[in-house]
Amino acid sequence: MMPKLKEELRTIFNDYGLKYVFDTNSQEIKVMKEKKPGEIFLIPFHSIADTLQRMIFYKAAIESNSKSALVFEEPEAHSYPPFISKVTQDIIQSDRNQFFITTHSPYVVNDFLELPSDKLAIYLVDFRNGETFVKRASDTEVQEMYEYGIDLFFNTETFLR
């Protein structure tokens, strides 16, 4: 596994008194809790919180790809908002890949609105009269979205005219 990702996972799990381990025999990620000296409790990957599973997936995808187009559908789904910012910040800092992200989260959108306009394109999608309608937001509209902040998803009709 990638050293930077390993270290970040160690830090995150350490905050909860847990240790992230990679079982080289089974090739599985596990979480370990030391109950007392010489006694451990192993938690299989599928049993850890959805937020942590998803964060590991997205971070591994970002770090293990280069010169790729990565498509993430609703990375905020089943995740605790503060942890999602750990993923969005990795996306923002990555200059090795191109990203396509669908979201219904104002937290995700607000993180990306910090990007310069030449690094960001926002497309709004609607369903009208049985047809899908897609519109790219202009730079002016993106600036307005930045100013609306959390209210963006309550004002989408403003941008879908």
Where are these regions (language model features)?
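Phosphate-coordinating catalytic segments in nucleotide- and nucleic-acid-processing enzymes
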Residues: 1-65, 69, 128-161
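Walker B catalytic acidic pair
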Residues: 73-75
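C-terminal lobe/lid and adjacent interdomain/linker elements of RecA-like ASCE P-loop ATPase modules
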Residues: 85-161
